Amino acid sequence: MLIKNKKSRKGSHMNEKVLTVVVPSYNVEAYLADTLKSFIHPDIMGDVEVLIVNDESTDSTEEIGRSFEVRYPQTFRVITKKNGGHGSTINRGIQEAAGRYFKVVDGDDWVDTENFRKLVKMLKRLDVDVVGNNYTWVDHETKLPTKRQERPFEGFEYGRIYRLEDVA
């Protein structure tokens, strides 16, 4: 799911990022490079901000994030903070988010790059408050899907655009 960023600058969409992805990260060196690679598509690099929020990892999580920050400075940024748990990393990312929308993707998860590209292109055209999406659980060792979750929000008609006041 992604949500509209209410602190985003209204009316100044020229240089604004469309989407901020907050990547909470704590000791995810085994997965982080795959996570970050999944956001890379030349059609959308200027539209996406990826904030890797390092929760004081003790492995090479920060170094992996910094390597993406150096290679793609217009898209990736590492924020290192005192260890405070998963929720505190999300909160810090939201505080720093510059995109019109934000989404959380944990440091041991990834997105389908082509579907992500389509999502970002769609967000450039629409003005919505919340977007829900399907997801699949994948076994990290075998890389095989274990469960696909379609229509994760019960009670909503899919294929419609809802305003935030309709769902909250």
Which residues does each PLM region occupy?
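Nucleotide-sugar donor-binding/catalytic module of glycosyltransferases
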Residues: 4-168
